[in-house]
Amino acid sequence: MASASLLKTSPVLDNPEFLKGQTLRIPSVAGVRFTPSGSSSLTVRASSYADELVKTAKTVASPGRGILAMDESNATCGKRLASIGLENTEANRQAYRTLLISAPGLGQYVSGAILFEETLYQSTTDGKKMVDVLIEQGIVPGIKVDKGWLPLPGSNDESWCQGLDGLACRSAAYYQQGARFAKWRTVVSIPNGPSALAVKEAAWGLARYAAITQDNGLDPILEPEIMLDGEHGIDRTFRVAQQVWAEVFFNLAENNVLLEGSSLKPSMVGPGALSARKGPPEQVADYPLKLLHRRRGPVVPGIMVLSGGQSEVEATLNLNAMNQSPNPWHVSFSYARALQNTCLKTWVEGQENVKAQDFACAKSNSLAQLGKYTGEGESEERKKDMFVKATLTY
């Protein structure tokens, strides 16, 4: 966790308006600022990988393609395997991951795949390196680098994301193994505030992660997930998302992160999962686009939205709605369950069925990225809600 002395004062969260209605009051942290004498100009840090970082970001943001998130921890993967009666063994994880990445033609619709560390170093059941299979399909390999969440002392029962220790060495090793982008997922809970401390911690961690991974050749995906837990409406989600992203970009600037060599992975802005007020795709699309226009210019090549537990069809319809009018960014998907759920269910019917479903789900979201998805002919299985209340591990 970032120490209090490292957390800069923020023009966003130090505004008392943000603290209204919260049970926890966080005093402003006195940040040390150095003002050079005489005239000066801001120099944005650019590592020796700058050109490659920009190229990677643009490749991931190529038209009609998005990200397959298959970075579940071994424990979470075990829960998914258990749902179809399989044991959580390395052999079963290897077999399932092999099926996910080996669907013929998958690279037409998937530009990047986020891997768990085991997968990055794993071979397929045919003995080929997973990374090589992806590259042959034109899919950029990525890696999850955070180490999960722990309780955040002094907060409203909120969490902080660990993993900065040793990140530089790990990033360098992942690059050598073939990874070209990274993912760091931190979470913000609306029912618990969110407190100013939790938002500052999330933003600072994301910024430090981004700077470290860029220095080692990995394009950072920035994912401050606004959790779906709660009964709040969409306007409450929107207000919190604005505060979170403002704080994130403030800290990215403080850490001289090269935005052209990064990607954003925002939550779709919708009501809480327990809210009775569910909006149509057009409304769910309008709020995140409004947020992005207010908080981020077009310098970031790709906006890869996460599904956050929505059903496969709902997530695809919402993405399609976001692409009904021109955007200054590539707005696409970075889905895990929304791409995998039906594939997993069909595994018991045969391996080829998994590949077919994998291809079909990716194609549907490719159409949504192009604004051409209709939702016609989708199975009832793909329409099932997949919300699961957040825990401190994943």
Curated annotation (Swiss-Prot):
Which SUPFAM superfamilies does UniProt cross-reference here?
Aldolase
| Record's keyword annotation contains rRNA processing | no
What keywords are annotated for this sequence in UniProt?
Answer: Chloroplast, Glycolysis, Lyase, Plastid, Schiff base, Transit peptide
Q: In which pathway does it act?
A: Carbohydrate degradation; glycolysis; D-glyceraldehyde 3-phosphate and glycerone phosphate from D-glucose: step 4/4
Main localisation: plastid
Protein name, UniProt field:
Fructose-bisphosphate aldolase, chloroplastic
Record-marked site positions (Necessary for preference for fructose 1,6-bisphosphate over fructose 1-phosphate) = 394
Q: Which residues form the active site?
A: 223 (proton acceptor), 265 (schiff-base intermediate with dihydroxyacetone-p)
Q: Which organism is it from?
A: Spinacia oleracea (Spinach)
